[in-house]
Amino acid sequence: MSDVSERGSVSVVCAAAICVALVCTMGIADVGRVLVERSHAEAAADAAALAAAQDLALGNGDPAADATRFATENATALVGCSCAIGADEAVVTVRRSFTGLLLVPGALSLDAEARAVVDLP
């Protein structure tokens, strides 16, 4: 009698296990995507800070404008730039926004900061 009442229960357990495995896989994919986006944001911040520091070292140009240009070319937005003429370092903060995560709806954004020091002899 107990065999009849439990008939088909393995199918339900397997379906639930497949759903859990699918959600876990989607979560792992989302974490991977966030890590890649963070890496892109950090690279963009590094490039923008180096461009601003180069302008500070050479004294030819606008460091903030070059930092903005490099940030934009790397698909980020310049949030902050501490790179005044005459300074010995450039500190740049950029923001990268992205969508397309599987478990998190809407847009997310990541900030990255980089510092480049002007080292003149």
Cite the ranges covered by each PLM segment.
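A general secondary-structure boundary signal
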Residues: 41, 89, 109-110
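Short amphipathic secondary-structure patches
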Residues: 49-98
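Residue-level preference for non-acidic, small/hydrophobic
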Residues: 45-46, 71, 114
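Arginine residue identity/basic-tract feature
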Residues: 7, 33, 38, 69, ...
